[in-house]
C-alpha cells in the first residue's frame, strides 16, 4: 500500500498522508499493517506528550536520543520550557555533474557554441586534479557525537555582544545566540529565529565556509531551496511531484543532471531525494529521452493518478483517528470501522497501566523562552 500511482518505489510521505486524512482504503491494509500503524501512532502520541525538544528527529538514532533525553527530563520534573538543542552543520564537497556548473574552469579557446559542451566535459573528466571546481555541500544532523568522532575539525559558532546589564554597567558580555529572559532588546539578535537551537560547524578542511548576511534589512531572498522546504513542510500525498515541478520550473533542462546528493541538499530527506531521483529515470523509461516537456507531462499524469486514486464513494477507508488502542483487538476494531479507545487531548499524556515510574500527569503548555534556572 506504500506505492503511489505510477511509482514502483515505496513512499512514506504518500502513505502516512493518506492515513492521516482517512483516505487510505481499508482493503489495502493487512492485520500486520494495522498493528504496526497502531504501535507507531501510540508511540507518537506519547512522545508528543512528554517532548520538550523543539527539533524533529530525522532518523531512528535521533529519535532514540531525543526520547531518552525526554524521559530524563520527565523524571527530573522538567516542565514548561523547551530545552536547547545542538545541531551540527557538516561541510563537505562533491563532484559536479552538470556541465553548466564548470563553465568558469574551461581553459581552452572556444571558437563557437558547439565547442562549449566538449570543453565542459573535459573539465568534468579532470576534476580529480582540480579541487577548486568541486561543489561545496552543507548538511545538518542532530547526532553531534557521531560528527565529533568522524570530522577532523569542529567549530562552535558563537557571536560575542556587549550590552547593558541589569545593574546599569556596560561590562556585561554574552556569547552565543541567547535572546534574553524578557525579550532583551539589547542582546545580540543574531540567529534569533529559534531561541532553543545552537549550531556547530564540522569542516573537513580549513577555509572560507559562508558569508554572513546583513541583518535588519527586512528583505529575504526567495531561493529555490526555500520554495522546496516550504512545499515539504506543507505536506501532501505527492510532495515529490510538487517539489519536482518547482525544480523543473526553476532549472529547466538542468534538472536531468541532478543527482541524489543534489536532491538531498534541497529537501534534506534521503527517502524523498531517492524518489525525486527516480523520477528522472521514469521520464526516460516512459518517453524514450529526457526533455522538459516529457518531465512536465509525467508530473501532470502523476497528479491525475493521485487524484483518481483517492477513496471512492462508498468504499471503506481506514479510520486513522480511531487507531489509538493498546491491543491488537482494538486495532482490528478500528480497521472494521468500530470506535477504539479515544485519544487524550492534544499535549496531554494518556495514563498507561504499566507506566508507574513516569506517571506524572500532563505537562503544562511548553514555551520557547528561557528560565533563570536554565541559565
UniProtKB/Swiss-Prot annotation:
Main location class: host cell
Keyword annotations of the record: DNA replication, DNA-binding, Host nucleus
Top-rank taxon: Viruses
Pfam families: Viral_DNA_bp
Gene Ontology MF terms in the entry: single-stranded DNA binding
Entry's Gene Ontology BP terms: DNA replication
Subcellular location: Host nucleus
GO cellular component: host cell nucleus
The keyword DNA-binding appears for this protein: yes
The protein's role, per its UniProt record: Single-stranded DNA-binding protein required for DNA replication.
Family recorded in the similarity comment: Belongs to the herpesviridae DNA-binding protein family.
Name under which the protein is recorded: Major DNA-binding protein
Amino acid at each position: 500500500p506504500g506505492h503511489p500511482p505510477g511509482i514502483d518505489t515505496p513512499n512514506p510521505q504518500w502513505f502516512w498522508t493518506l492515513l492521516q486524512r482517512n483516505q487510505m482504503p481499508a482493503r489495502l491494509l493487512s492485520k500486520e499493517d494495522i498493528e504496526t500503524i497502531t504501535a507507531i501512532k501510540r508511540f507518537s502520541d506519547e512522545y508528543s506528550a512528554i517532548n520538550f525538544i523543539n527539533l524533529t528527529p530525522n532518523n531512528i538514532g535521533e529519535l532514540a536520543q531525543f526520547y531518552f533525553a525526554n524521559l530524563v527530563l520527565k523524571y527530573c520534573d522538567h516542565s514548561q520550557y523547551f530545552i536547547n538543542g545542538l545541531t551540527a552543520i557538516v561541510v563537505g564537497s562533491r563532484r559536479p555533474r552538470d556541465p553548466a556548473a564548470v563553465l568558469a574552469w574551461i581553459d581552452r579557446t572556444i571558437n563557437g557554441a558547439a565547442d562549449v559542451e566538449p570543453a565542459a566535459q573535459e573539465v568534468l573528466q579532470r576534476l580529480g586534479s582540480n579541487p577548486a571546481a568541486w561543489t561545496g555541500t552543507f548538511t545538518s544532523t542532530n547526532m553531534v557525537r557521531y560528527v565529533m568522532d568522524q570530522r577532523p575539525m569542529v567549530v562552535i559558532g558563537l557571536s560575542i555582544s556587549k550590552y547593558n546589564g541589569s545593574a546599569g554597567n556596560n561590562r556585561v558580555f554574552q556569547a552565543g545566540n541567547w535572546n534574553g529572559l524578557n525579550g532583551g532588546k539589547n542582546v545580540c539578535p543574531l540567529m534569533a529565529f529559534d531561541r532553543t537551537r545552537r549550531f556547530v560547524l564540522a569542516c573537513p578542511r580549513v577555509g572560507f565556509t559562508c558569508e554572513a548576511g546583513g541583518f535588519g534589512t527586512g528583505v529575504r531572498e526567495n531561493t529555490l531551496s526555500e520554495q522546496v522546504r516550504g512545499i515539504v513542510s506543507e505536506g501532501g500525498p505527492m510532495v515529490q511531484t510538487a517539489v519536482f515541478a518547482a525544480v523543473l520550473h526553476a532549472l529547466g533542462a538542468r534538472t536531468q543532471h541532478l543527482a541524489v546528493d543534489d536532491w538531498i541538499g534541497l529537501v534534506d530527506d534521503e527517502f524523498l531525494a531517492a524518489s525525486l531521483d527516480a523520477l528522472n529515470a521514469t521520464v526516460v523509461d516512459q518517453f524514450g529521452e529526457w526533455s522538459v516537456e516529457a518531465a512536465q507531462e509525467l508530473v501532470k499524469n502523476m497528479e491525475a493518478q493521485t487524484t483518481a486514486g483517492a477513496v471512492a464513494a462508498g468504499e471503506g477507508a481506514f479510520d486513522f483517528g480511531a487507531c489509538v488502542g493498546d491491543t491488537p483487538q482494538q486495532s482490528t476494531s478500528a480497521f472494521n470501522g468500530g470506535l477504539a479507545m479515544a485519544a487524550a487531548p492534544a499535549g496531554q499524556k494518556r495514563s498507561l497501566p504499566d507506566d508507574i515510574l513516569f506517571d506524572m500527569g500532563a505537562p503544562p503548555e511548553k514555551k520557547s523562552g528561557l528560565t533563570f534556572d536554565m541559565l
